[in-house]
């Protein structure tokens, strides 16, 4: 029975996808285990890659600034580096904080 309960979210995703194939995954918030299940569904045997940021990078923006070459007197270089860092969004930013589509999930498949 534990195995059945484990696959319940995946079965729910499959049901939603089959009932409205054009709208079920147009764009959705996917977080935690739901995000992992969706990646398994989209990527299948290819698998997927995910490299989360360390807790230090998430919690301390000053550390991220220093690692990007920022700090006092960095000026335009610091601004440019922060803009580039913001453009490099991870899957959690794309799909949990914001919303994402199946096509965006496929970018994380091997």
From Swiss-Prot:
UniProt propeptide residues: 57-87
SMART domains hit by this protein: IlGF
Single GO MF descriptor: receptor ligand activity
Primary location: secreted
Zinc-finger as UniProt keyword: no
Keyword terms, alphabetized: Carbohydrate metabolism, Cleavage on pair of basic residues, Disulfide bond, Glucose metabolism, Hormone, Secreted, Signal
Signal peptide: 1-24
Cysteines engaged in disulfide bonds, as pairs: 31-96, 43-109, 95-100
Transport is among the record's keywords: no
Localization per Swiss-Prot or TrEMBL: Secreted
A cellular component annotation (GO) from this entry: endoplasmic reticulum lumen
Biological process according to GO: D-glucose transmembrane transport; ER overload response; glucose homeostasis; glucose metabolic process; insulin processing; insulin receptor signaling pathway; intrinsic apoptotic signaling pathway in response to endoplasmic reticulum stress; lipid catabolic process
Similarity section: Belongs to the insulin family.
PANTHER family in alphabetical order: INSULIN-2, INSULIN/INSULIN GROWTH FACTOR
The protein's role, per its UniProt record: Insulin decreases blood glucose concentration. It increases cell permeability to monosaccharides, amino acids and fatty acids. It accelerates glycolysis, the pentose phosphate cycle, and glycogen synthesis in liver.
Complex formation: Heterodimer of a B chain and an A chain linked by two disulfide bonds.
Protein name: Insulin-2
Organism listed in the record: Mus musculus
Gene that encodes it: Ins2
């Amino acid at each position: 029975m534990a195995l059945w309960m484990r696959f319940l979210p995946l079965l729910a995703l499959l049901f939603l996808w089959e009932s409205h194939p054009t709208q079920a995954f147009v764009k959705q918030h996917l977080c935690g285990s739901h995000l992992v299940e969706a990646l398994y569904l989209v990527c299948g045997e290819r698998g997927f890659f995910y490299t989360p940021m360390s807790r230090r990078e998430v919690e301390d923006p000053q550390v991220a600034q220093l690692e990007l070459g920022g700090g006092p007197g960095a000026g335009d270089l610091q601004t440019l580096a922060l803009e580039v860092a913001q453009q490099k969004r991870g899957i959690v930013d794309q799909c949990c904080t914001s919303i994402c589509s199946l096509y965006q999930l496929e970018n994380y498949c091997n």
